[in-house]
Amino acid sequence: MKIGILDCIVRWNSFLQKPFMTGRERRIYERVLLGLQGRQPLDIFEYGSGFSTLYFARFLRSRNVRFHVHSVEHNKAWHLDIKRRIGQAGLGQEVTVHLSEFSPGCAPPKTPAELNYVNMPRALGRTFDLIVVDGRFRRCCLEAAMSCLKPQGIVFLHDAERTFYHGPLGRFKHSAFIDGGHYYPFEPRQHKVWLGSLDNGHLHHYTG
């Protein structure tokens, strides 16, 4: 079986328990977290659980930032794996991983589980300092994020180079596309991160 460069990167990142992001994307995420730390305890919501859930929770803890992350995942086996790793890392008090199980597809969310996934931050009845959109139904999740984001809060959209996700972006008062770099030299795909906010006009400070 032929293994491509990205396959090798995915396997290596999994071995290291690092998020599937470019190095530049991780640094942008870290700068956003540090820029928000004055609002402790940070309330964070994440669409799509993974090694990023674990990695950035460890990052915050290593800097003595008080926080709580709510993360929702649609794949039960992956959810259980990440939940186990979070427990092993001693992060069970800081990270809550929710499951809303459904089979992935291309259609808009329709089933109760799919709608529950999109509306999870609303159902929690709170507003968030940071909402990370990196899972299923990203357009719908961006729209849902608007109603549960604190005025100075930030939405972080991964894979923002995909124009299919751009529909709701204009509804945010402030926004910034940031170069996310590449996974490897000469990679044809140019990765981007998008940051959006209702009332935070300093998003370009995170370009770095």
Which residues are covered by each model-predicted region?
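A short alpha-helical cap/connector motif
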Residues: M1-L130, R136-K150, I154, A160-G208
